[in-house]
Amino acid sequence: MEEKEGIKDSSLLEKSNVPESINEDISKTTDVDLNSDGKKDNDTSAKDGTPKVEEKVNKSSGIDEDEVVTPAEDAKEEEEEHPPLPARRKSEEEPSKENPILQELKDAFPNLEEKYIKAVIIASQGVLSPAFNALLFLSDPESGKDIELPTQPVRKNPEAPARRRQTQLEQDELLARQLDEQFNSSHSRRRNRDRATRSMHEQRRRRHNPNEREQHHEDSEEEDSWSQFVEKDLPELTDRAGRSLQDTANKVSNWISDAYRRNFASGNEQNDNQHGHQDQQEWEPEIVDLSQGGKNSRPQQPERRRFNSFGVQVGDDSLESHGITLHNEDGFEDDEDVPPQLPTRTKSGESTGKVVAETTYIDTPDTETKKKWQPLPPEPLDTTPTKVNAVSRNKKNPDEDEFLINSDDEM
């Protein structure tokens, strides 16, 4: 470096002694060369080994080639003069491969060997506080006088096993249990309340009568057995009874259907046809009687009879309905036939106490036509009613009263 600096100083002194004309020519030539592809000229001059600038300078001034300095050399010299830039540090420091707990304990206890420190770390399972206390006791035994040694091993809480994912059926079952507890809690509370009240009453009784303890114990056992029977055994019994009834019903129905198929379905068609007509005739009057009885069984309002001014029932033309019969009170007429009479039997001593037949008259149909009864013509009605007419109208003849006339219905 010192030799190069000496060469630079000598070259600068020589340049200062060159006349001004030479400097002007050099500046012109250098400006032209740099503006018009200076790189190409420099390359060609480097290949040929005869740069143009040096030739012109040598021709005009007669300076040696060794004394001339090119601009490339000047740039190199300037770079050598400036100090190199410092290397950039990496932003991310590489993590140390050594265990940080081990390194920390080494720094805290440099006097102890590394194997003891590792043994303490293994025993403490990486917990710093017990490891630090153990290493402190190794370095200074007097510091561990106040520390009590454990007599029993430390119990660790068992880690809960990984909960497996529940299926849809399990989720539904869990939800059903929650709903049952929520909505049926009232029934359970009522039951617990009843038990509490019973227990209170029984305790009061025991205080008054200490002999009832044994009886209370027996009663409690009976209640427990009864509650167990109602809650567990009764549903099973009901299920079994229902199943047995269903089975028996199915068996009976199958047996009846088989018997019907054997006896009735495969019967003789001729017997069915013979008895069919008779059965139909026997059943018809019963059906009619039932229908009539059903009609008559209904309550009916009594019919109201209406009579006209002549004492005749309205809507009935027959004489019998009027309640009037015509007969001769004097006896039989001459033309009418007298019915025959049976001879009377004399009573004997042997026949006393026996029933004797008496003569009876036998009615015979009348051959002659009887006279029909005709009603009397009505009386003329006065347009102007008077007291006499009104009284006469209101009065009734006792012979015309329907209740005093002997009718066929009363007979």
Swiss-Prot record:
Signal sequence, start to end: none
InterPro entries: CUE, Cue5/Don1_CUE, UBA-like_sf
UniProt modified residues of type Phosphothreonine: 70, 167, 346, 352, 364, 367
A single cellular component GO annotation: cytoplasm
Database matches in PROSITE patterns: CUE
Gene Ontology BP, a term: autophagy
Domain CUE: 97-140
Effect of residue 109 to A: Impairs interaction with ubiquitin
Cross-linked residues, Glycyl lysine isopeptide (Lys-Gly) (interchain with G-Cter in ubiquitin): 15, 59, 76, 156, 354, 396
Lineage top rank: taxon: Eukaryota
Residue ranges, compositional bias (Basic and acidic residues): 1-12, 25-58, 209-219, 230-242
Main localization category: cytoplasm
Domain-related comment: The ATG8-interaction motif (AIM) is required for the association with ATG8.
Role of this protein: Connects the ubiquitin pathway to autophagy by functioning as a ubiquitin-ATG8 adapter and thus mediating autophagic clearance of ubiquitin conjugates under starvation conditions. The CUE5-dependent selective autophagy pathway plays an important role in clearance of cytotoxic protein aggregates. Not required for cytoplasmic to vacuole pathway (cvt), mitophagy, pexophagy, or ribophagy.
Name of the protein in its database record: Ubiquitin-binding protein CUE5
Name of the gene this protein is made from: CUE5
